[in-house]
Regions:
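A short helix-loop-beta-strand connector motif used in the catalytic cores of GNAT acetyltransferases and
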Residues: 38-49
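Short, basic/aromatic recognition patches
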Residues: 31-37
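Conserved beta-strand in the GNAT
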Residues: 49, 55-64, 71, 76
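Short amphipathic alpha-helix that is part of the acyltransferase structural core
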Residues: 1-31
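Conserved acetyl-CoA-binding loop-helix of GNAT-fold acetyltransferases
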Residues: 77, 83-97
Length: 109
């Protein structure tokens, strides 16, 4: 199984809520509140996702200043893919300085 990690790849409400429901986070997130979920996605400025083919299997959803602080709010991995290191890789990629530098340059003009 090849897992592809993407930075700030656009995901739909359906993909995000589907993943939350397939992980243990669905029980603790407002998955039925469309406006809230849309705000959660839209207002996150760092989203690291894990994909197997076209299937979203993991997400690290963050708010960051791209220089010093990063708050990782949601870390979700589909239960069918847990215990394979995907969550750990999502955290590693979330902390990867090269992504911070590249994204910070896009934001600041």
């Amino acid at each position: 199984m090849a897992v592809e990690y993407k930075i700030n790849e656009e995901i739909s409400l359906k993909q995000f809520t589907g993943l939350l429901n397939r992980s243990t986070l669905g029980e603790r997130r407002p998955v039925d509140d469309v406006e809230c979920i849309q705000g959660m996605i839209s207002n996150s400025n760092l989203l690291v996702t894990a994909w197997v083919g076209s299937n979203l299997v993991g997400v690290s959803r963050c708010v960051t200043d791209f220089h010093y602080c990063c708050y990782l709010s949601d870390l979700a991995v589909d239960t069918a893919y847990q215990k394979e290191g995907i969550g750990k890789q999502l955290q590693i990629k979330t902390q990867d300085k090269k992504y911070f530098e590249a994204l910070a340059k896009k934001r600041i003009t």
